[in-house]
A protein has these predicted regions:
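C-terminal catalytic/motor cores of large multi-domain enzyme assemblies
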Residues: 1-272
Length: 272
């Protein structure tokens, strides 16, 4: 039996089938992973590229490519069962402005596995510009504005009811289509506000199994392939993911593939 956002994974081994019962919550099944990416080839490539793109847009393009190549990391746990998500989607946090009191909003971007880097970057840029528009609310902002007008006890009752319906896979598509907490991963760029990457918890609401945080670009000592030590520009990326969706070896090889795409962005040129 499937859901409107994924299909039940068949042929799951007994241990993996047991994991949701042994670790019923996402935050009880967290794995932390960190990468330091060498940007010595990346930044000149970005500067020379026309039309211009940002490191964040490049990262999203790399993630889209990896998620299309390694489908097991596009799975999620719901109702104690393992599902294969039927789309590649990433949720993005956007601050309306650099003012510390400016509101933060979230948007969900859906991509096609055949998207080129140009397709992905254009999509991300459009969504971020729309989210920054103070005069225009995102779908999630409209929904939250309506719900938060209700009494607290009623909000909690609604959330509990929705989680119960979601457990049985009966939530209608319109309730999850634009919800940022129903996506392949949450991708946050703390580097855009000058901060280092941090580990973030997973949300028990929704079904996101990955949280990915990019830090600021900085200089750091790096040992090259020739064994020589040099100072290069790097970025740290920290991941939090639900180990119940697939094994650690599969996940780590997928994330190392992402490293290859960011450190050698020419690999993303052309169609997948």
């Amino acid at each position: 039996m499937g859901r409107n956002d994924g299909d039940l994974v068949a042929g799951v081994g007994p241990l993996r089938r047991m994991l949701p019962s042994l670790m019923p919550s996402r935050n009880g099944a967290l794995v932390y992973y960190e990468q330091q990416l060498d940007l010595s080839k990346t930044l000149p490539w970005i500067e020379a590229r026309q039309p211009s793109i940002t490191l964040y847009e490049l990262a999203i393009a790399g993630l889209v490519r990896v998620w299309s190549e390694r489908p097991q990391i596009n799975r999620f746990i719901a109702g104690g069962k393992l599902y294969q998500r039927d789309e590649i989607s990433f949720s993005i946090s956007v601050k309306k402005s650099l003012d510390e009191n400016a509101p933060l909003t979230s948007i969900k971007a859906v991509f096609d596995p055949s998207d080129t880097i140009e397709d992905t970057c254009k999509r991300v840029e459009e969504l971020i510009e729309r989210a920054k528009d103070h005069k225009r609310e995102t779908e999630s902002e409209k929904e939250m504005r309506f719900v938060t007008k209700l009494p607290i006890f009623f909000i909690r009752w609604l959330v509990a009811l929705q989680r119960m319906v979601d457990w049985f896979g009966l939530l209608p598509r319109f309730m999850t289509r634009n919800d940022p907490l129903y996506s392949s991963a949450y991708v946050v760029n703390l580097g855009s506000v000058g901060l280092e990457a941090a580990y973030h918890h997973l949300y028990e609401y929704g079904n996101i199994p990955f949280f990915i945080v990019l830090g600021k670009v900085k200089k750091a000592p790096v040992v090259g392939d020739d064994g020589e030590l040099s100072v290069r520009e790097v970025v740290n990326i920290r991941y939090t993911f639900d180990e119940r969706i697939t094994d650690g070896f599969y996940t780590s090889t997928a994330l190392e593939r992402f490293r290859e795409y960011i450190e050698n962005p020419k690999l993303l040129d052309g169609p997948p």
